[in-house]
């Protein structure tokens, strides 16, 4: 029967991954943003796509990883011992700490600044790759485009703009809850992005979403 077939397909799906590496690889290789978004819509999660201007730097880039949220702020030029965190007196604030804190399979996700300078670049990509991170998604621009493309590092941004964040902005917090557009992003949520955009899968529903998206994707291929 159809019910039995569905059961066996989902049982087979559950055997396709036994750890986070395999789960995220399955997302990258077998899913796409539209089907993930459709599934979350049906579950009542109707605001999970980042604004449409956040696009891959190259059309074939796909990102699937765990969110490491980073909060940026425009730099007012203020310095001194009155600051709660002396790291904020550094030229990039907590940016170097954020890069150093990246873990395997994580995605650097940044918001909070005005769209007047680049939030990601080649050297940041190099640091991220060395730490096992799998992508960057920024609510703003990226730069050093040639270098990022040569590294084949998935980068999603508003597009290319060379103006540097120093002395215009600083990272002020990391591993915190952030919001991009209407989407709340918490540490550990799954970030999935492809040519059609970037969506956020809340950690608490990731298993149900990915299983349903896999079933829907494979069902559509059979039609």
Describe the function of each predicted region.
Residues 1-14:
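Short, Lys/Arg-enriched N-terminal segments with co-localized hydrophobic residues
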Residues 12-98, 219-221:
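Intrinsically disordered, low-complexity regions enriched in acidic/Ser/Thr/Pro/Gln residues
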Residues 37, 47-48, 66-69, 106-109, ...:
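Structural motif
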Residues 40, 128, 189-191:
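Buried hydrophobic positions in well-ordered alpha/beta secondary-structure cores of metabolic enzymes
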Residues 97-139:
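Extracellular/luminal Protease-associated
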Residues 137-139, 145-193:
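A contiguous pocket-lining binding segment that forms or flanks enzyme active sites
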Residues 190-223:
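A hydrophobic, small-residue-rich beta->alpha segment in the mid-to-C-terminal subdomain
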